[in-house]
From Swiss-Prot:
Keyword entries, A-Z: Antiport, Chloroplast, Hydrogen ion transport, Ion transport, Membrane, Plastid, Plastid inner membrane, Potassium, Potassium transport, Transmembrane, Transmembrane helix, Transport
Protein name (Swiss-Prot/TrEMBL): Potassium/proton antiporter CemA
GO CC term (a single one): chloroplast inner membrane
Molecular function GO labels: antiporter activity; proton transmembrane transporter activity
Subcellular location per the Swiss-Prot or TrEMBL entry: Plastid, Chloroplast inner membrane
Function comment: Contributes to K(+)/H(+) antiport activity by supporting proton efflux to control proton extrusion and homeostasis in chloroplasts in a light-dependent manner to modulate photosynthesis. Prevents excessive induction of non-photochemical quenching (NPQ) under continuous-light conditions. Indirectly promotes efficient inorganic carbon uptake into chloroplasts.
InterPro entries in alphabetical order: CemA
Amino acid sequence: MPKKKALTPFPYLASIVFLPWWISLSFTKSLEPWVTNWWNTGQSKTFLNDIQEKNVLERFIELEQLFLLDEMIKEYPETQIQKFHIGIHKETLQLVKMHNEDHIHIVLHFSTNIICFAILSGYYFLGNEELVILNSWVQEFLYNLSDTIKAFSILLVTDLCIGFHSPRGWELMIGSVYKDFGFAHNDQIISGLVSTFPVILDTILKYWIFHYLNRVSPSLVVIYHSMNE
């Protein structure tokens, strides 16, 4: 029985890692045609208005330079003028199609994120026994490590997450999450999160070190401060 309980967290941990990814991928593949059809038929009018007001005008900044050539075009034959307008029309359709696909992918990503969150929540509430065993494994593993290795690991993780070279990594990660949930890219909001989130983590870490590690392992705190200096 103990051996059986010891082996239980292995498939549990593997399912936590792979099952949400597999279900979200299957969901995306099966739902994409339906979402595409729904968006193209039911949301096309609203979407085109949004494109005209926000996105396409920005993409047409480069095309505005072409309209400065009107004086030259007036000297062209009628067939050349028609070709010019046909080219502009094709470019407009291409931009609308590209933005349409982006919005469809945003809907799919948002849906799969909700599914993954629901699956992980189910694991948390339904797998209490496995979580207890897994937690005991982690605590036993950390307990068997020396204080030097623990201090080195804490220092490595903190330098990676809140070190002086970490803002670029936080910017990429927050920007990716921001885009994955369908929000428009905003440099000011991302910069604000990058400048505040590591500070919050640093404060939490210092609180954890001084109020928890000082009671559990004072020698670890001494080694950590010695390595940090």
